[in-house]
Protein backbone atom coordinates (compact mmCIF):
# COMPACT_ATOMS: atom_id res chain seq x y z
CA UNK A 1 0.00 0.00 0.00
CA UNK A 2 1.16 3.49 -0.81
CA UNK A 3 0.18 6.76 0.85
CA UNK A 4 -1.95 7.45 -2.24
CA UNK A 5 -3.80 4.16 -1.77
CA UNK A 6 -4.41 5.02 1.87
CA UNK A 7 -5.82 8.44 1.02
CA UNK A 8 -8.08 6.90 -1.64
CA UNK A 9 -9.51 4.33 0.79
CA UNK A 10 -9.53 6.40 4.02
CA UNK A 11 -9.92 9.91 2.65
CA UNK A 12 -7.85 12.98 3.37
CA UNK A 13 -8.73 13.59 7.01
CA UNK A 14 -6.78 16.79 7.58
CA UNK A 15 -9.18 19.70 7.65
CA UNK A 16 -8.37 23.36 7.23
CA UNK A 17 -5.23 22.62 5.27
CA UNK A 18 -3.23 25.62 4.12
CA UNK A 19 -2.12 26.37 0.59
CA UNK A 20 1.02 28.45 -0.13
CA UNK A 21 -0.64 31.88 0.09
CA UNK A 22 -2.26 30.95 3.40
CA UNK A 23 1.09 29.73 4.79
CA UNK A 24 2.60 33.10 3.86
CA UNK A 25 -0.28 35.12 5.34
CA UNK A 26 -0.78 33.10 8.53
CA UNK A 27 2.77 32.02 9.38
CA UNK A 28 5.61 33.65 7.48
CA UNK A 29 4.42 37.25 7.01
CA UNK A 30 3.46 37.93 10.67
CA UNK A 31 6.44 36.04 12.15
CA UNK A 32 9.27 37.96 13.78
CA UNK A 33 11.86 35.22 13.36
CA UNK A 34 11.38 33.53 9.97
CA UNK A 35 14.14 34.71 7.66
CA UNK A 36 14.06 32.06 4.95
CA UNK A 37 11.51 29.73 3.35
CA UNK A 38 12.52 26.64 1.36
CA UNK A 39 9.87 24.83 -0.64
CA UNK A 40 9.33 22.54 -3.60
CA UNK A 41 6.82 20.48 -5.54
CA UNK A 42 5.77 23.43 -7.63
CA UNK A 43 6.79 25.07 -10.84
CA UNK A 44 6.86 23.67 -14.34
CA UNK A 45 8.70 20.86 -16.07
CA UNK A 46 12.11 21.88 -17.48
CA UNK A 47 12.09 22.81 -21.16
CA UNK A 48 14.09 20.29 -23.19
CA UNK A 49 15.10 21.14 -26.75
CA UNK A 50 17.34 18.05 -26.71
CA UNK A 51 19.48 16.19 -24.16
CA UNK A 52 22.22 18.82 -24.38
CA UNK A 53 19.91 21.84 -24.19
CA UNK A 54 17.76 21.79 -21.06
CA UNK A 55 16.30 24.90 -19.41
CA UNK A 56 15.74 24.07 -15.73
CA UNK A 57 14.63 27.58 -14.76
CA UNK A 58 10.86 26.78 -14.79
CA UNK A 59 11.42 24.24 -11.98
CA UNK A 60 13.13 26.67 -9.60
CA UNK A 61 12.65 30.19 -8.33
CA UNK A 62 14.08 32.67 -5.86
CA UNK A 63 12.60 35.86 -4.50
CA UNK A 64 12.71 38.21 -1.54
CA UNK A 65 9.51 39.55 0.02
CA UNK A 66 8.87 41.89 2.93
CA UNK A 67 7.45 40.60 6.22
CA UNK A 68 4.96 42.68 8.23
CA UNK A 69 7.78 44.50 10.03
CA UNK A 70 9.57 45.44 6.79
CA UNK A 71 12.43 42.96 6.96
CA UNK A 72 13.33 40.72 4.05
CA UNK A 73 12.22 37.08 3.87
CA UNK A 74 14.19 35.02 1.36
CA UNK A 75 12.20 32.34 -0.49
CA UNK A 76 13.66 29.57 -2.62
CA UNK A 77 11.61 26.98 -4.52
CA UNK A 78 13.31 23.97 -6.08
CA UNK A 79 11.37 21.13 -7.69
CA UNK A 80 13.90 18.43 -8.40
CA UNK A 81 11.23 15.78 -8.89
CA UNK A 82 10.70 16.96 -12.48
CA UNK A 83 14.39 17.38 -13.30
CA UNK A 84 14.36 14.70 -15.97
CA UNK A 85 11.50 16.38 -17.82
CA UNK A 86 8.60 14.39 -16.41
CA UNK A 87 7.24 12.86 -13.21
CA UNK A 88 8.74 9.41 -13.63
CA UNK A 89 11.96 7.83 -14.77
CA UNK A 90 14.89 8.78 -12.56
CA UNK A 91 12.83 10.81 -10.11
CA UNK A 92 14.32 14.04 -11.37
CA UNK A 93 17.83 12.69 -11.99
CA UNK A 94 18.60 13.00 -8.24
CA UNK A 95 19.14 16.77 -8.30
CA UNK A 96 19.99 18.25 -4.89
CA UNK A 97 20.40 21.80 -3.69
CA UNK A 98 23.51 22.06 -1.55
CA UNK A 99 23.39 24.98 0.89
CA UNK A 100 26.73 26.14 2.33
CA UNK A 101 26.29 28.37 5.36
CA UNK A 102 29.21 30.82 5.33
CA UNK A 103 31.16 31.91 8.45
CA UNK A 104 29.82 35.49 8.23
CA UNK A 105 26.42 34.19 9.45
CA UNK A 106 24.59 35.99 6.63
CA UNK A 107 25.66 34.35 3.37
CA UNK A 108 24.47 31.00 2.04
CA UNK A 109 26.07 29.55 -1.08
CA UNK A 110 23.65 27.55 -3.23
CA UNK A 111 24.81 24.90 -5.71
CA UNK A 112 22.84 22.30 -7.68
CA UNK A 113 24.29 18.79 -7.95
CA UNK A 114 23.27 15.32 -9.16
CA UNK A 115 25.04 12.39 -7.46
CA UNK A 116 23.46 10.17 -10.12
CA UNK A 117 25.33 11.98 -12.90
CA UNK A 118 28.50 12.16 -10.79
CA UNK A 119 28.70 8.34 -10.62
CA UNK A 120 29.42 7.71 -14.29
CA UNK A 121 32.38 8.95 -16.32
CA UNK A 122 29.93 9.39 -19.21
CA UNK A 123 27.77 11.88 -17.28
CA UNK A 124 30.16 13.47 -14.74
CA UNK A 125 30.36 16.60 -16.87
CA UNK A 126 26.62 17.14 -16.21
CA UNK A 127 26.76 16.63 -12.41
CA UNK A 128 26.89 20.34 -11.50
CA UNK A 129 24.37 22.80 -12.90
CA UNK A 130 25.98 26.23 -13.21
CA UNK A 131 23.35 28.60 -14.61
CA UNK A 132 22.74 31.71 -12.49
CA UNK A 133 19.49 30.24 -11.07
CA UNK A 134 21.32 27.04 -10.03
CA UNK A 135 24.44 28.55 -8.47
CA UNK A 136 24.19 31.75 -6.42
CA UNK A 137 24.63 33.33 -2.98
CA UNK A 138 21.75 34.25 -0.68
CA UNK A 139 22.20 37.01 1.89
CA UNK A 140 20.10 36.81 5.05
CA UNK A 141 19.55 40.01 7.05
Task: Indicate where each model-derived feature is located.
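Active-site-proximal segments of metal-dependent phosphoesterases and phosphodiesterases across multiple
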Residues: 1-35, 46-59
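Active-site metal-binding loops of divalent metal-dependent hydrolases
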Residues: 1-2, 40-42, 79-81
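Compositionally biased, low-complexity repeat tracts
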Residues: 26, 36-39, 87-88, 101
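Proline-centered loop/turn at the N-terminus of a beta-strand
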Residues: 35-36, 74
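Binuclear metal-dependent phosphoesterase catalytic core
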Residues: 45-141
